[in-house]
Regions:
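Short, small-residue-biased leader/transition segments that mark boundaries at the very start
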Residues: 2-4
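Juxtamembrane extracytoplasmic/periplasmic/luminal helical "stalk" adjacent to the first N-terminal
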Residues: 7-68
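Short, hydrophobic-rich beta-strand element in sensory/regulatory alpha-beta domains
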Residues: 56, 86-91, 177-180
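Solvent-exposed, extracytoplasmic
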Residues: 69-83, 154-206
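Extracytoplasmic/periplasmic ligand-binding sensor regions of membrane-associated signaling proteins
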Residues: 93, 97-171
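Extracytoplasmic/periplasmic sensor domains and loops in membrane signaling proteins
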Residues: 100-131, 196-234
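Helix-start (N-cap) segments at beta->loop->alpha junctions
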Residues: 144, 156-168, 185, 250-254, ...
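Extracellular/periplasmic juxtamembrane segments that couple receptor/chemosensory ectodomains to their
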Residues: 207-268
């Protein structure tokens, strides 16, 4: 017959297995919900990019049909009113621009624009103007020409990041979900973090400096980002344990990342 000690050990074993099963079930259900929310934001971001690139090609066709500066200005100002973009730029390969009103300046783009334009492909990048908020800029090199004496190699429209962030809904989990859009090398395109204490410029570097992940785990995650894979894991930042979910996008080799505190998700 089974002695009391064996029964206790067997009961303890069953208890541990049950707790492990419950923990794994909670983890799978929680990350599945997070992945669903991230996928929804991903689709909305892709649709935003598709629509705005389509607008740029439409504007290019108009620019090819006329060289009348006043007509061009009226057309673009009407388009801006209808669509709601922040700015329209005639852009040279070195980042200098002119607006339809004739204002000139330099668009601080986070990329080597001349190399990108040489490829002849549409571009979506982060940019900043002095004293203004970060912007997401859509660039189309389909048409080159001159506007009010300014020679341009591409046209572009911009949105302030606040407008883009509306797509990355962090209202779930009582507003405790942080979302990021990153390049595959970890550089941050869009930072939609809650309770932000400092700007994150590279997500991988942030994890290396501030998380409990080993170097091997970080390298594996970096490879997932580089290959556009999807996945999930737990990570500790400071004193808080988080679910981290990520999904590659079809937009310019970006990856979307979501971070939500474990205790918030498990309480939902």
């Amino acid at each position: 017959q089974m002695c009391i000690r064996d029964r206790v050990l067997l009961a303890a074993s069953f208890s541990l297995q049950y707790l492990s099963f419950v923990s794994q079930t909670i983890y799978q259900e929680s990350t599945s919900h997070l992945e669903e929310l991230l996928h929804k934001s991903n689709n909305m971001l892709k649709e935003m990019v598709r629509k705005n690139v389509s607008y740029l090609h439409l504007y290019n066709r108009f620019l090819e049909s006329t060289s009348d500066a006043d007509a061009i200005q009226a057309y673009i100002e009407k388009a801006q009113q209808d669509i709601g973009f922040a700015g329209f730029y005639f852009l040279s390969y070195d980042g200098n621009y002119m607006t339809v009103t004739g204002e000139t300046g330099y668009l601080g783009l986070q990329t080597n624009l001349d190399e990108k334009l040489a490829d002849g492909e549409d571009i979506v990048v982060n940019a900043a103007l002095p004293g203004k908020a970060q912007m997401l800029v859509f660039i189309c090199p389909e048409t080159q020409g001159s506007y009010r004496g300014f020679a341009y190699d591409a046209v572009a429209i911009s949105y302030y990041n606040d407008a883009v962030l509306k797509l990355l809904d962090n209202s779930a989990f009582q507003g405790n979900a942080s979302n990021y859009v990153i390049y595959r090398d970890g550089r941050v395109v869009i930072d939609n973090s809650v309770n932000r204490k400092k700007t994150i410029y590279n997500f991988i570097a942030m994890l290396r400096d501030s998380s409990d992940l080993s170097e091997e785990e970080i390298l594996t995650l970096s490879d997932d980002f580089a290959q556009g894979r999807s996945g999930n894991m737990k990570v500790t930042l400071g004193d808080t344990r988080y679910y981290l979910v990520y999904e590659g996008t079809a937009v310019h080799n970006w990856t979307m990342v979501g971070l939500v505190p474990v205790n918030i998700v498990n309480a939902s």
